[in-house]
């Protein structure tokens, strides 16, 4: 998961019209898809050969309980309806993350931490979501990878639990997605081994790593985690490893 500054996308709000089902607007869907280089905002799965799904981060029509977590049961039958046409609540994603498939999928789940109060139309900022939000820089920093596995990048117990819940709901542990991340990790591990043995130059190694960690690359957050874990300091110092 990479940080996505949605404010830079919302400057195009006037292009999307005023429809009652704004998330279906074709221009909006293209803008959201293109903004993160044709990738899912949650999983970094390339959106090649599949439609982009516009997810409502806070569900628009209903809210379902997840495990034993608190949730906004006061609006369980109508959801966060007042945010249905608010593009700041939209996240572009793939079918793996958005729909209930396999063991995960976001659907209408929106679990909350025990602290905080329920959000209402008049009071929007007091809920504490368990789901990590790619549009919140501090959330993105909590999640990392080790090989094809999702791991927390924090010792905080609540942070660890948020990573676990997000990995499950966003389907980050799906077999296909995990396998593709594993390929990225293995390729970088091999590249660094070739650099260490002198088979490739430092400049060649850095050039290939820059491609792998680029926001345009699939699963680039996993690539960054691999570089942080395995690369020597003289390589890391030449790279932008900010999520």
Residue ranges and their predicted role:
Residues 31, 81-82, 132-133:
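Short Gly/Pro-enriched turn/cap motifs at secondary-structure boundaries
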Residues 1-26, 46-48, 237-243:
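A boundary/linker detector
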Residues 151-243:
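C-terminal, charged low-complexity interaction regions
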Residues 17-29, 71-79:
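Short Cys/His-rich Zn2+-coordinating modules
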Residues 28-53, 94-97:
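Short cysteine-rich loop/turn motifs with clustered Cys
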Residues 108-160, 168-172, 177:
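Long, low-complexity, intrinsically disordered segments enriched in glycines and aromatic residues
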